[in-house]
Amino acid sequence: MSYKKTDALMRHLRDSGISIQGPKQKRQLINTGYFHGYKGYRFFGNAHRRLPFTSYDEVYATIQYDSDLKALLYGKMMFIETAVKNIALESILVNANSESIQDMYDKVVSGYNNAPASATIEQKRKLQQNKLNLQNSIQSSLAYAYKKNNPKITHFYNNIGYSDVPVWALFEIMTMGDLGYLLSCLTYDVRDDISKRLFLNVSCDTDRQLIYKYIYTLKDLRNAIAHNAVVFD
């Protein structure tokens, strides 16, 4: 299968009903890329909802709009991620009264033995499984960071003065998805504390689930912005 050079891609676009010509639009196609640009922006939401473009001007305007939208959201998204991480971290440290990851597991993460009194056996088992999954995820993240010589983690493993990685260092390598899962595994009291620190309306959040559901909702948008994926749809 042969690849197409820019001129051939322009002919292919014209054959597909997209008007494109001249050095200006050729440069725009080169800069935005055929696969990232045209192929990435010709649909809205999914491949079954094709946008009715007839000229490359329309395609390029859509790409520019999407880029401007990402630029507008980037700073705000980074602020939200950083603020929520630090507020959650402070709450965990205070409620665990320790910076130890093991103490975090024992004191502020829900499991079989600290499940609500009203929990059924099955609910207790689910909480314990979630806790085990969390521990496995955190260990995998630490192992990967160590393998990649991340100084935020290797400092603690390679220094005889430390016995383990503290919670605050763990937070430095957590993705937004990791953060959301950790928040979902915390005890009700700690989720309640974090929610109030964030001034969330807890009166409409009986189970204190909004804190991690918001993070899950924002996660995909954050990743799309960071990796220059399409966000306008």
Task: Label each region the model flagged.
Residues M1-D233:
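Amphipathic alpha-helical interface elements
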